[in-house]
């Protein structure tokens, strides 16, 4: 007959004895267990957490062995009690039942994208169901066009004002081959708009997009370097000076980094004012070390065309731009004039957005992307690609890539 193995577990013995006798519990409070033939006594203790706390690891049971307290799961390591965030069983009511609900909420600077309200009910089939979208889980998307510190006054990137508050969190700096600086505009967590000319800076016109990608360095927020995965040029970029940049990873959205919203209506009206930020050259023709911005008005397109091309010029005309370079002017572009302080954009600002504030929804939208940044307060107009004219291409490109 095999020997009988006995294990005696003493649970909270000291506490129980102290209650019964009214004396203070000590290490010797527990009496020795009676011995029986062909056995040995093994002592164990169980740690228990206070109400609303639970053990972080192990089952709390420790056996005394070779003068050491050992837990089978975590050895000599002592357990820890952490806050128990599980819901206790609710009390029952007469003629009623308990329905379990959960609500999904997004982190700051994110919002629910789906039409549901984030509330899910646990049904009899053990499924979490939302009344609007069923079993489909909600998605949190980045908030756009809601800077924590928006521009709140008319200030004066030729001269311009410093963006000390972070009013333009969608502004990115692009450094291309030969350390040439230009702008780019964040439009979601992973994509940016810039100009095709910017992407070709330092490259010959026959370069492929895949060859341009590894030469780019891109910075968002407070000089946060992000890795570029690919660039996509507009199929007609000789007439539509636009390209897209895809990042290898999504950027976390916060008060320093936030996309600008794409417009659902046309904000380009003569006289409408908007803001442009950038890292381009200043009044001394040096690249600025700090992000600057300027407020500029939408200009009359016909006057802008005449300014650059000359009145009644023949079709085979040569460029008459005051700066010796002809901008792209067509149905996909619009012109912006100088500020009342004669401030302007300049070399290096291209790719930045002309943003407008919609008071109805208190949101900022990208109305245009600066294409011609060579006016530098010498010419009267800067030229921008109209964002509404490229929306379909932008959406299809993002969806397919």
Curated annotation (Swiss-Prot):
Glycans are attached at residues 286, 316. Residues 157-399 form the Peptidase S1 domain. The beta chain mediates most of the interactions with both subunits of hemoglobin, while the alpha chain forms the homodimeric interface. This is Haptoglobin. Tetramer of two alpha and two beta chains; disulfide-linked. The hemoglobin/haptoglobin complex is composed of a haptoglobin dimer bound to two hemoglobin alpha-beta dimers. Interacts with CD163. Interacts with ERGIC3. As a result of hemolysis, hemoglobin is found to accumulate in the kidney and is secreted in the urine. Haptoglobin captures, and combines with free plasma hemoglobin to allow hepatic recycling of heme iron and to prevent kidney damage. Haptoglobin also acts as an antioxidant, has antibacterial activity and plays a role in modulating many aspects of the acute phase response. Hemoglobin/haptoglobin complexes are rapidly cleared by the macrophage CD163 scavenger receptor expressed on the surface of liver Kupfer cells through an endocytic lysosomal degradation pathway. It is found in: Secreted, Extracellular space. Disulfide bonds join 49-81, 106-140, 144-261, 304-335, 346-376. InterPro entries: Peptidase_S1_PA (IPR009003), Peptidase_S1_PA_chymotrypsin (IPR043504), Peptidase_S1A (IPR001314), Sushi/SCR/CCP_sf (IPR035976), Sushi_SCR_CCP_dom (IPR000436), Trypsin_dom (IPR001254). One of its GO terms (biological process) is immune system process. The keyword Repeat applies. Keywords: Acute phase, Antibiotic, Antimicrobial, Antioxidant, Disulfide bond, Glycoprotein, Hemoglobin-binding, Immunity, Repeat, Secreted, Serine protease homolog, Signal, Sushi.
